[in-house]
C-alpha cells in the first residue's frame, strides 16, 4: 500500500488596513476584540486570558494590557486605522481607550459609546450590605 503524502495548507493572511476595536468593560473583567469593517474578528484578548485572576481582572492596568495584546496581534494582519466602540461601566474603560491611542503605528479614527441603556427595563440588583 502506498503511503499518502500529508500536505499542509499555507495560512494566507489578508492585509486589512482599517478595523474596529470593541472594548467591553464589565465590573469583573475587560474584553477587547479587534474586527475588520465587516465585523469579522481578527484578534481578541481579555484580562483573564492574560493571567490576571480574581479582583485583579477588573483593574485599569489589566485592561491596558488586554488592549495592547489584542492590538499587537491585529498589527500582524496590517491594521493601521481603528475606530473604538466601548461598552459597559467597568473600571478599566478609560484606561483601555487611552491605551489604544498609545499603541505605536495605529491611528484612531472615531470613538463611540455603545453601552445599552434601559428605558426602565429590568429591576437592578439590590445594594450590597457588608
Swiss-Prot record:
Keyword terms: Ribonucleoprotein, Ribosomal protein, RNA-binding, rRNA-binding
This protein's GO CC annotations: ribonucleoprotein complex; ribosome
Any GO molecular function: rRNA binding
InterPro entries attached to this UniProt entry: Ribosomal_uS11, Ribosomal_uS11_bac-type, Ribosomal_uS11_CS, Ribosomal_uS11_sf
Pfam families assigned: Ribosomal_S11 (PF00411)
GO biological process: translation
Superkingdom of origin: Bacteria
Family affiliation: Belongs to the universal ribosomal protein uS11 family.
Function field: Located on the platform of the 30S subunit, it bridges several disparate RNA helices of the 16S rRNA. Forms part of the Shine-Dalgarno cleft in the 70S ribosome.
Subunit details: Part of the 30S ribosomal subunit. Interacts with proteins S7 and S18. Binds to IF-3.
Name the UniProt record assigns to this protein: Small ribosomal subunit protein uS11
Origin species: Campylobacter concisus (strain 13826)
